[in-house]
Amino acid sequence: MSIYFISDIHGCYKEFKLLLKKSFFNDKKDFLWIAGDLVSRGPDSLKVIRYLYSLRKRIKIILGNHDLNLIAVYSGVKENKKENYFDEFLSAKDNLQLINWLRCQSILKIDEERKIIMSHAGISPKWDIDTAKKYALEIEKCLSGKNYSSFLRSVFNNKINYWNLNLNKLDRLRYSINVFTRMRYCYPDSRLNLICKKSPNLVKYPLIPWFKIPNKIPKEYSVFFGHWSSLIGTKVPQPFFPLDSGCCWGGKLTMFRWEDKKYFFQSFQKNNS
Protein backbone atom coordinates (compact mmCIF):
# COMPACT_ATOMS: atom_id res chain seq x y z
CA MET A 1 0.00 0.00 0.00
CA SER A 2 1.33 3.42 -1.00
CA ILE A 3 0.11 6.98 -0.45
CA TYR A 4 0.25 9.41 -3.36
CA PHE A 5 -0.22 13.18 -3.28
CA ILE A 6 -1.47 15.44 -6.07
CA SER A 7 -3.11 18.86 -6.35
CA ASP A 8 -4.72 21.25 -8.81
CA ILE A 9 -6.01 18.75 -11.36
CA HIS A 10 -8.26 21.54 -12.67
CA GLY A 11 -10.32 19.37 -14.98
CA CYS A 12 -7.25 17.96 -16.76
CA TYR A 13 -8.70 14.45 -16.86
CA LYS A 14 -6.50 13.07 -19.63
CA GLU A 15 -3.28 14.11 -17.89
CA PHE A 16 -4.58 12.86 -14.55
CA LYS A 17 -5.29 9.37 -15.89
CA LEU A 18 -1.92 9.25 -17.66
CA LEU A 19 -0.16 10.24 -14.44
CA LEU A 20 -1.95 7.59 -12.40
CA LYS A 21 -0.74 4.99 -14.89
CA LYS A 22 2.79 6.38 -14.98
CA SER A 23 3.05 6.34 -11.17
CA PHE A 24 1.70 2.77 -10.88
CA PHE A 25 -1.19 3.88 -8.68
CA ASN A 26 -3.27 0.83 -7.76
CA ASP A 27 -6.87 1.76 -7.00
CA LYS A 28 -7.39 -1.52 -5.13
CA LYS A 29 -4.70 -1.00 -2.49
CA ASP A 30 -3.18 2.50 -2.71
CA PHE A 31 -4.51 5.81 -1.40
CA LEU A 32 -4.58 9.16 -3.18
CA TRP A 33 -4.50 12.45 -1.27
CA ILE A 34 -5.68 15.42 -3.35
CA ALA A 35 -4.95 18.95 -2.15
CA GLY A 36 -7.86 20.66 -3.87
CA ASP A 37 -8.86 22.41 -7.08
CA LEU A 38 -10.21 19.35 -8.82
CA VAL A 39 -12.17 21.49 -11.27
CA SER A 40 -12.18 24.61 -13.49
CA ARG A 41 -9.67 25.96 -16.04
CA GLY A 42 -9.31 22.57 -17.76
CA PRO A 43 -12.02 21.08 -20.01
CA ASP A 44 -13.10 17.95 -18.14
CA SER A 45 -14.23 18.87 -14.63
CA LEU A 46 -17.21 16.52 -14.79
CA LYS A 47 -15.04 13.56 -15.81
CA VAL A 48 -12.60 14.29 -12.99
CA ILE A 49 -15.34 14.51 -10.36
CA ARG A 50 -17.09 11.37 -11.58
CA TYR A 51 -13.86 9.42 -11.61
CA LEU A 52 -12.89 10.55 -8.12
CA TYR A 53 -16.37 9.71 -6.88
CA SER A 54 -15.84 6.17 -8.19
CA LEU A 55 -12.58 6.04 -6.18
CA ARG A 56 -14.06 7.65 -3.07
CA LYS A 57 -12.99 4.80 -0.75
CA ARG A 58 -9.34 5.21 -1.82
CA ILE A 59 -8.98 8.99 -1.75
CA LYS A 60 -8.77 11.89 0.68
CA ILE A 61 -9.83 15.24 -0.76
CA ILE A 62 -9.22 18.79 0.38
CA LEU A 63 -11.43 21.48 -1.13
CA GLY A 64 -9.74 24.35 -2.93
CA ASN A 65 -11.04 27.76 -3.95
CA HIS A 66 -12.19 26.50 -7.36
CA ASP A 67 -14.07 23.60 -5.79
CA LEU A 68 -15.87 26.04 -3.51
CA ASN A 69 -16.61 28.17 -6.56
CA LEU A 70 -18.25 25.20 -8.30
CA ILE A 71 -20.46 24.58 -5.27
CA ALA A 72 -21.32 28.30 -5.16
CA VAL A 73 -22.17 28.41 -8.88
CA TYR A 74 -24.28 25.27 -8.61
CA SER A 75 -26.26 26.73 -5.70
CA GLY A 76 -26.81 30.08 -7.44
CA VAL A 77 -24.54 32.05 -5.14
CA LYS A 78 -22.08 32.92 -7.91
CA GLU A 79 -22.42 33.49 -11.64
CA ASN A 80 -21.05 30.85 -13.98
CA LYS A 81 -18.25 32.12 -16.22
CA LYS A 82 -16.93 30.71 -19.48
CA GLU A 83 -13.44 30.08 -18.11
CA ASN A 84 -14.87 27.82 -15.40
CA TYR A 85 -15.83 25.09 -17.91
CA PHE A 86 -18.77 24.22 -15.62
CA ASP A 87 -21.53 23.97 -18.27
CA GLU A 88 -21.23 20.21 -18.69
CA PHE A 89 -21.30 19.67 -14.93
CA LEU A 90 -24.29 21.97 -14.42
CA SER A 91 -26.34 20.09 -17.01
CA ALA A 92 -25.35 16.59 -15.82
CA LYS A 93 -28.12 14.40 -14.41
CA ASP A 94 -25.95 13.28 -11.48
CA ASN A 95 -24.72 16.74 -10.47
CA LEU A 96 -26.74 16.88 -7.24
CA GLN A 97 -25.23 13.61 -6.04
CA LEU A 98 -21.75 14.84 -6.92
CA ILE A 99 -22.22 18.27 -5.31
CA ASN A 100 -23.56 16.73 -2.10
CA TRP A 101 -20.52 14.45 -2.00
CA LEU A 102 -18.10 17.26 -2.83
CA ARG A 103 -19.35 19.68 -0.19
CA CYS A 104 -18.85 17.01 2.49
CA GLN A 105 -15.12 16.78 1.78
CA SER A 106 -12.45 18.25 4.04
CA ILE A 107 -10.72 21.60 4.31
CA LEU A 108 -7.71 20.17 6.14
CA LYS A 109 -6.26 16.67 6.51
CA ILE A 110 -3.79 15.63 9.19
CA ASP A 111 -2.24 12.19 9.64
CA GLU A 112 -0.73 12.30 13.11
CA GLU A 113 0.86 8.86 12.79
CA ARG A 114 2.77 9.71 9.60
CA LYS A 115 3.15 13.40 10.55
CA ILE A 116 1.46 14.68 7.39
CA ILE A 117 -0.58 17.86 6.90
CA MET A 118 -2.47 18.68 3.70
CA SER A 119 -4.19 21.97 2.90
CA HIS A 120 -5.03 23.57 -0.42
CA ALA A 121 -3.26 26.89 0.16
CA GLY A 122 -1.60 26.52 3.56
CA ILE A 123 -1.96 27.12 7.30
CA SER A 124 -1.89 30.49 9.03
CA PRO A 125 1.47 31.20 10.69
CA LYS A 126 -0.60 32.30 13.69
CA TRP A 127 -2.10 28.84 14.22
CA ASP A 128 -0.85 25.66 15.82
CA ILE A 129 -2.18 22.33 14.55
CA ASP A 130 -5.05 22.14 17.03
CA THR A 131 -6.22 25.64 16.11
CA ALA A 132 -6.07 24.84 12.39
CA LYS A 133 -8.10 21.66 12.94
CA LYS A 134 -10.69 23.57 14.97
CA TYR A 135 -11.34 26.20 12.31
CA ALA A 136 -11.22 23.75 9.41
CA LEU A 137 -13.92 21.73 11.15
CA GLU A 138 -15.99 24.88 11.59
CA ILE A 139 -15.95 25.43 7.81
CA GLU A 140 -16.64 21.76 7.08
CA LYS A 141 -19.74 21.78 9.27
CA CYS A 142 -21.10 24.81 7.41
CA LEU A 143 -20.41 23.34 3.97
CA SER A 144 -21.93 19.95 4.76
CA GLY A 145 -25.02 21.43 6.42
CA LYS A 146 -28.38 22.12 4.79
CA ASN A 147 -27.78 25.89 4.82
CA TYR A 148 -24.52 25.65 2.87
CA SER A 149 -25.65 28.10 0.18
CA SER A 150 -26.33 30.81 2.78
CA PHE A 151 -22.89 30.18 4.22
CA LEU A 152 -21.25 30.56 0.81
CA ARG A 153 -23.26 33.70 0.09
CA SER A 154 -21.74 35.44 3.11
CA VAL A 155 -18.27 33.97 3.53
CA PHE A 156 -16.32 35.27 0.52
CA ASN A 157 -14.58 38.47 1.62
CA ASN A 158 -11.11 39.76 0.75
CA LYS A 159 -11.06 42.33 3.54
CA ILE A 160 -10.64 39.86 6.40
CA ASN A 161 -6.89 39.36 6.13
CA TYR A 162 -5.82 39.37 9.78
CA TRP A 163 -6.24 37.06 12.74
CA ASN A 164 -7.19 37.82 16.30
CA LEU A 165 -9.26 36.04 18.90
CA ASN A 166 -11.84 38.83 18.93
CA LEU A 167 -13.13 38.18 15.41
CA ASN A 168 -16.83 37.39 15.32
CA LYS A 169 -17.86 34.00 13.92
CA LEU A 170 -18.52 35.18 10.38
CA ASP A 171 -15.25 37.08 10.11
CA ARG A 172 -13.43 34.11 11.63
CA LEU A 173 -14.92 31.88 8.93
CA ARG A 174 -13.96 34.40 6.26
CA TYR A 175 -10.39 34.54 7.49
CA SER A 176 -10.19 30.75 7.72
CA ILE A 177 -11.52 30.27 4.17
CA ASN A 178 -8.95 32.76 2.91
CA VAL A 179 -6.13 30.96 4.70
CA PHE A 180 -7.03 27.43 3.70
CA THR A 181 -7.98 28.12 0.07
CA ARG A 182 -6.47 31.43 -1.12
CA MET A 183 -3.34 32.38 0.83
CA ARG A 184 0.00 32.88 -0.90
CA TYR A 185 1.78 35.86 0.61
CA CYS A 186 1.79 37.37 4.08
CA TYR A 187 3.18 40.56 5.52
CA PRO A 188 5.74 40.28 8.34
CA ASP A 189 2.93 40.58 10.92
CA SER A 190 1.16 37.59 9.24
CA ARG A 191 -1.58 39.66 7.60
CA LEU A 192 -2.64 38.06 4.32
CA ASN A 193 -2.09 39.58 0.91
CA LEU A 194 -4.77 38.04 -1.31
CA ILE A 195 -3.86 39.90 -4.50
CA CYS A 196 -0.31 39.01 -5.52
CA LYS A 197 0.10 35.71 -7.41
CA LYS A 198 3.60 36.21 -8.80
CA SER A 199 6.63 34.01 -8.26
CA PRO A 200 8.58 34.86 -5.10
CA ASN A 201 11.54 35.45 -7.41
CA LEU A 202 9.72 38.55 -8.69
CA VAL A 203 8.34 39.88 -5.39
CA LYS A 204 10.10 42.01 -2.80
CA TYR A 205 9.71 42.66 0.92
CA PRO A 206 7.37 43.24 2.72
CA LEU A 207 5.55 40.40 0.93
CA ILE A 208 6.75 37.03 2.19
CA PRO A 209 5.58 33.54 1.13
CA TRP A 210 3.39 32.19 3.92
CA PHE A 211 5.68 29.19 4.46
CA LYS A 212 8.66 31.46 5.17
CA ILE A 213 6.90 33.26 8.03
CA PRO A 214 7.80 31.80 11.46
CA ASN A 215 5.05 29.31 12.26
CA LYS A 216 3.80 26.92 14.94
CA ILE A 217 3.90 23.69 12.91
CA PRO A 218 6.03 21.01 14.62
CA LYS A 219 9.24 20.43 12.67
CA GLU A 220 8.56 16.71 12.24
CA TYR A 221 5.47 17.34 10.09
CA SER A 222 5.48 17.39 6.28
CA VAL A 223 3.07 19.94 4.77
CA PHE A 224 1.58 19.32 1.31
CA PHE A 225 -0.21 22.13 -0.49
CA GLY A 226 -1.20 23.34 -3.96
CA HIS A 227 -2.79 26.56 -5.24
CA TRP A 228 0.43 28.30 -6.27
CA SER A 229 1.68 27.29 -9.72
CA SER A 230 4.07 30.25 -9.95
CA LEU A 231 6.23 28.61 -7.27
CA ILE A 232 7.81 26.57 -10.07
CA GLY A 233 11.54 27.32 -10.02
CA THR A 234 11.39 28.66 -6.46
CA LYS A 235 13.29 26.96 -3.66
CA VAL A 236 10.73 25.97 -1.02
CA PRO A 237 12.14 24.96 2.36
CA GLN A 238 11.40 21.59 3.87
CA PRO A 239 9.09 20.38 5.31
CA PHE A 240 6.83 22.11 2.73
CA PHE A 241 5.90 20.27 -0.47
CA PRO A 242 4.18 22.38 -3.17
CA LEU A 243 2.24 20.26 -5.67
CA ASP A 244 0.72 22.73 -8.16
CA SER A 245 2.81 22.76 -11.33
CA GLY A 246 0.32 24.54 -13.58
CA CYS A 247 -1.02 21.79 -15.82
CA CYS A 248 -4.09 23.82 -16.79
CA TRP A 249 -1.76 26.63 -17.94
CA GLY A 250 0.26 24.30 -20.18
CA GLY A 251 2.58 23.04 -17.45
CA LYS A 252 2.33 19.62 -15.86
CA LEU A 253 0.70 17.58 -13.13
CA THR A 254 2.90 16.52 -10.24
CA MET A 255 2.43 13.45 -8.05
CA PHE A 256 4.48 12.50 -4.99
CA ARG A 257 4.73 9.02 -3.50
CA TRP A 258 5.19 9.10 0.24
CA GLU A 259 6.96 5.81 0.87
CA ASP A 260 10.02 6.39 -1.33
CA LYS A 261 9.68 10.19 -1.69
CA LYS A 262 9.54 9.86 -5.48
CA TYR A 263 8.00 12.42 -7.83
CA PHE A 264 6.08 11.64 -11.01
CA PHE A 265 5.15 14.16 -13.70
CA GLN A 266 2.76 14.38 -16.63
CA SER A 267 2.96 17.24 -19.12
CA PHE A 268 -0.11 19.03 -20.43
CA GLN A 269 -1.54 17.44 -23.58
CA LYS A 270 -2.18 20.08 -26.25
CA ASN A 271 -5.06 18.23 -27.89
CA ASN A 272 -6.98 18.00 -24.62
CA SER A 273 -10.57 17.10 -25.29
UniProtKB/Swiss-Prot annotation:
Catalysis performed (reactions): P(1),P(4)-bis(5'-adenosyl) tetraphosphate + H2O = 2 ADP + 2 H(+)
Keyword Hydrolase applies: yes
Keyword Cytoplasm: no
Keywords, comma-separated and alphabetical: Hydrolase
CDD domains: MPP_ApaH
Origin: domain of life: Bacteria
GO MF term set: bis(5'-nucleosyl)-tetraphosphatase (symmetrical) activity
InterPro entries xrefs: ApaH, Calcineurin-like_PHP_ApaH, Metallo-depent_PP-like
TM annotation in the entry: none
This enzyme's EC code(s): 3.6.1.41
HAMAP family reported in the protein's UniProt record: ApaH (MF_00199)
Family annotation (NCBIfam families): apaH (TIGR00668), PRK00166.1 (NF001204)
Family: Belongs to the Ap4A hydrolase family.
Function: Hydrolyzes diadenosine 5',5'''-P1,P4-tetraphosphate to yield ADP.
This protein's name: Bis(5'-nucleosyl)-tetraphosphatase, symmetrical
Organism, as annotated: Buchnera aphidicola subsp. Schizaphis graminum (strain Sg)
Gene: apaH
